[in-house]
Amino acid sequence: MTTSTTSRLAIGASCVLIFGATALAQTSPSPAPAAAPPAPKFEPTATITTPGYPGVGPADSKLRIVNLPGGKKLHLLPATLDTTQWGWFDNAQAPVLRVNSGDTIALETMMHSHNQVVPGTTIEQIKKTRTDFPGRGPHTLTGPIYIEEAQPGDVLKVTLNKIVPRAYATNFNVPGLFGQFPTLYADGQVKYLYLDLDKMTTEFLPGVVIPLKPFPGTLAVARKEPGRYSSVPPGEFAGNMDIRDFVVGTSLYVPVHVPGALLWTGDSHAGQGNGEVNLTALETAYREFNITVEVIKGKPLDFPRIETKKSWISMGFDQDLNKAWTQTKAQTVKLLAELRGVSAEQAEKLMPSVSDCRVSQVVNVKKGIHCLNPKNARDREDLERPTRETPKYLVSHAKDADLNKAMNDASMGMIKMLEADKKVARLDAYGLASVAMDCRVGAISDAEKNVHCVMPKSIWVKQ
């Protein structure tokens, strides 16, 4: 298969409020993923290497800059083999772009595996891109981008201004590998979907229409540890968070670990369910991903946060969903104490009544939970946690002392419900749950942890 080298994406930004400054140690630290086996060092060059045009010569960075009002700059960053890496983060990687705090970047992203997962690629070929490169992630990452003022201990704010996806997306489960239930799905399938960017919908199945909600699955700064690491697990550097609320108009705040921060993005999504259970979302690439970067000094942060118009999003990650919850709870308590000006003990008591917590994903080695926390004390998030079908939702509820098992039971319950009640084929039900199901964390105690997975009935439309 030939590898396409073009894919378009741009990023833009808007301003948001700043957070409190007190840092809190991570409550449930996870062991850092082991470095990948040694591989040939990728040495990027500034030479354009588009097939058919060898030796064009070094790129001129000045030709990638557009001046904006107020003395700011817009940087244009195309996705080529020279401006992307496949599957690795490495803080020794030479920057492909250098910008200043306050600058805006309009960049492109590629589909998985350097644009190899495109309409026509079979599930067997997709599986081969994973099995032939053990330890390597599937994501093609545009970057790294060096932000001149950023130093360890600073915070990098990245605001999403605009997202323009390609005209298509894919959803697939790799046979017998990855996903929430790899042993139950030894068979796999790939679906290619048309994205109607006028209506902002895609038809997943005949009569099943999914609203599009584009967001970057992966946005990362460099880790503090040297070496080459898979792009799959998220962490304190952000990375493969797969938080579907991270959309245009929101901002990521992430601690800086190395000079220049080194910013990457990829794993571009047109939409996703909370859980992403079959491994993939509506996987696409961006013709334009428009962002603005800002370095914040003197306000240390120990873990990423996301700011929306009305909420702050806290998060946690671990291979064990119970520990991911413990970390998310600690980050949420810290955030609520800052927002409301109360003690940690008071914030912990407040959390169940104001924080809307969801299972972000369970397929990225480190599973994720995130909580939406209203900025205004009078506001409330969506705390609906149904245990049976409602006029609005199909519902699958499970409880167990182990949050991993509760999540497994609730999500599989929804998949079986789609098969039995909606007559959706087995692999299609797995995929539909991955792109449209919303798994919510309910009441939590040592003895019992509740997960409520809901599916909006509104996605079934009359033919």
Mark where each language-model region is.
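Bacterial N-terminal signal peptides that target proteins for export
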Residues: 1-13
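N-terminal, Lys/Arg-enriched amphipathic/low-complexity engagement segments
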Residues: 60-133
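Short, structured beta-strand/loop micro-motifs enriched in basic residues and often containing a Trp
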Residues: 80-90, 134-142, 229-237, 414
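Conserved mixed alpha/beta catalytic, RNA-binding, or beta-rich assembly cores of soluble enzyme
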Residues: 214-240, 244-322, 333, 384-401
